[in-house]
């Protein structure tokens, strides 16, 4: 079963260039291991939240378009991975090994299989 791992981070947290490099190296190693296992089926890093545009329309009303991400949290979605795991426990285990989980939040969500992909 496929799971989306939504990686959330505080984009305003100050980190050194050395720490940024350490994190990038850790993510690359994690992704290489997942590819070798045949479990990484997709994913991308996202541009900063300030580049987001939010589109909302409730109950068929007027469309509201706003610059920026949906508010309410200091952590923003920084990227996502799509992994193929045997079950939720396996996906949670994978999420705990993502370096971003050590300094942010990883939301694990099953992918709805529609047959369209």
Segments the model singles out, each with a brief description of its role:
Residues 1-117:
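Conserved, structured core segments of small domains
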